[in-house]
UniProtKB/Swiss-Prot annotation:
This is Large ribosomal subunit protein bL9. Keywords: Ribonucleoprotein, Ribosomal protein, RNA-binding, rRNA-binding. SUPFAM superfamilies: L9 N-domain-like (SSF55658), Ribosomal protein L9 C-domain (SSF55653). One of its GO terms (molecular function) is structural constituent of ribosome. Belongs to the bacterial ribosomal protein bL9 family. GO terms for biological process: translation. It comes from Bacillus cereus (strain AH187). The keyword Ribonucleoprotein applies.
Amino acid sequence: MKVIFLKDVKGKGKKGEVKNVPDGYANNFLLKQGLAAEATNSSMKTLEAQKRKEEKDAAAELENAKQLKETLEKLTVELKAKSGEGGRLFGSITSKQIVDAMQKSHNIKLDKRKFEMDDAIRALGYTNVTVKLHPQVTATVKVHVSEQ
């Protein structure tokens, strides 16, 4: 019996796959558990339409990420912090503070977990911070820390 997997089934198939499985296995397990649906003409058409929609959504998401990258790479995020001798900060600048500053000054809202910082910023001056917007799109934001 041909079935369309609705969920990943270990050793049998992944979500969205169409496979031929034994009738008893399909009727007694896959269909009853809601793990698969019978592969009829209408369900095949629905699956194709769903795949096209997912591809279209993924392409739109990638395009949005590319546009956001262009915007971010033109920006400089300005932050003020107290510092001691030699330009060392009292404390540090974290990704959350960068996100808050971007929200206030440029009205761009990002998740702080998208910032790839090995360590917090601990010195005055300019620092480049990478932001992973999409698995295929990475931007660099310039952060300027000045004395308060």
